[in-house]
């Protein structure tokens, strides 16, 4: 399992003193000096505050809990025995290696056993894990593991396709390159036909 308990609120800072907002602003001023800028010039006076506020929003996933989102499920599926598929869930994240953006879409399917969840909660689970420092591989596994733990479905399929700005803006600088990762559990792991059907639906034009 890939630390879906990381879906509980900020386990690293539990019991630790979190830096004050002013300390974050000071760190950003230091960064501006390091790149050769003058943090006291007019255009940059409010930049440390703005960046600190932006980071608070961009990484809000550390303060959100999978349990709070998936803790309430519906246990009456009324005889429905086909997959539930939510595709084209847009997200943004940041790579944990360079803190540079990742932009992409998630496609998720699960085959209910006795539990279903509101469709909006599927999208919220993507946000919980994407709004953190991530690797795409870990994020894919975390989403699948979270759904496995709380829904206990017959099968789960997760496909994420994303563009990594660390490949576009630096390093190899390959614009438009897309990374695809998948995670299959249960019936989707065992049944090649189910996998193929999922992939066909994902690739089908909306």
From Swiss-Prot:
Pfam entry (one): GTP_cyclohydroI
Pathway stated in the Swiss-Prot or TrEMBL entry: Cofactor biosynthesis; 7,8-dihydroneopterin triphosphate biosynthesis; 7,8-dihydroneopterin triphosphate from GTP: step 1/1
PANTHER family: GTP CYCLOHYDROLASE 1, GTP CYCLOHYDROLASE I
Record has Hydrolase as a keyword: yes
Enzyme Commission (EC) number: 3.5.4.16
Species: Bartonella quintana (strain Toulouse) (Rochalimaea quintana)
Keyword Thylakoid on entry: no
GO cellular component terms, A-Z: cytoplasm
EC class name: hydrolase
Superkingdom of the organism of origin: Bacteria
Disulfide bridge partners, by residue number: none
Residue positions binding Zn(2+): 95, 98, 166
UniProt xrefs under NCBIfam families: folE, PRK09347.1-2, PRK09347.1-3
Single Gene Ontology BP annotation: tetrahydrobiopterin biosynthetic process
Annotated gene: folE
Gene Ontology molecular function, alphabetical: GTP binding; GTP cyclohydrolase I activity; zinc ion binding
UniProt-listed HAMAP family: FolE (MF_00223)
PROSITE patterns linked to this entry: GTP_CYCLOHYDROL_1_1
Name by which UniProt lists this protein: GTP cyclohydrolase 1
Family: Belongs to the GTP cyclohydrolase I family.
SUPFAM superfamilies noted in UniProt: Tetrahydrobiopterin biosynthesis enzymes-like
